[in-house]
Amino acid sequence: MTAKQRWLDARWAFVRAHLPPAPARVLEIGCGPEGGFVPAMREHGFAAVGVDPVAPSGPGYHRTEFEKHQLSEPVDVIVACTSLHHVTDLDEVLARAAEALTPGGVLIVVEWAYERFDEATARWSFDRLPDSGERGWLHSHHEQWLASGQPWDDYLEGWAGREGLHRGDAICRALQARFHTRLRTHAPYFFPDLHPVSEADEQAAITADGIRATGLHYVATRPAAALG
């Protein structure tokens, strides 16, 4: 099983818990080449579609950016999993998400708060990188950080700036400006790339060892009228 599939399997319970009853209409922003949660949502009776420039081919998937996707009708739910920190214009994407939702519709966000990825958390993660098998993004960061000769914080901020990433706290502020917050919490994030480290293992280290939870879970509803 790939790290991506381990991630989707681990986060499906959270997404499923906040979906309204089927057959609600659901759109996933940034479903990726695997289709994100769309297959699982369809299995559970939801009318789910995925939007991503690298979405799978086939019915229900749209190979385009969400900002350019034309909806035929509003949806009941939008799911965004580790996609918002990558978008070019966060405000534009969230404005379109609010427009795409029915009044009272649900927004489910699974994100990464990269600003919480401090050196202690990085070292804990790098110490647990698998020696064989799939080499993922954490392997690359470990190698690039060592090669840079920079302090970790300088390396991380430089990389995030070059990639144009949005901070988790900035994502939350932008969400709160347009939606009614129902839930906001941090969670383990790195375990899928550290197999056989489990989510419980990472949570235990967060609780006992002082590493930081960099995952971000956020659930909100679209108000009947614009906020502010």
Regions found by a protein language model. Name each.
Residues G32-K68:
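Class I SAM-dependent methyltransferase SAM/SAH-binding core
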Residues Q5-P23:
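Conserved alpha-helix/loop element of class I SAM-dependent methyltransferases that forms part
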Residues D169-R173, A177, R182-G228:
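A C-terminal cap/extension of S-adenosyl-L-methionine-dependent methyltransferases
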Residues P23-G32, I108-S140:
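Conserved class I S-adenosyl-L-methionine
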Residues Q144-A174:
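A conserved mid-domain beta-alpha-beta active-site/ligand-binding segment of alpha/beta enzyme cores
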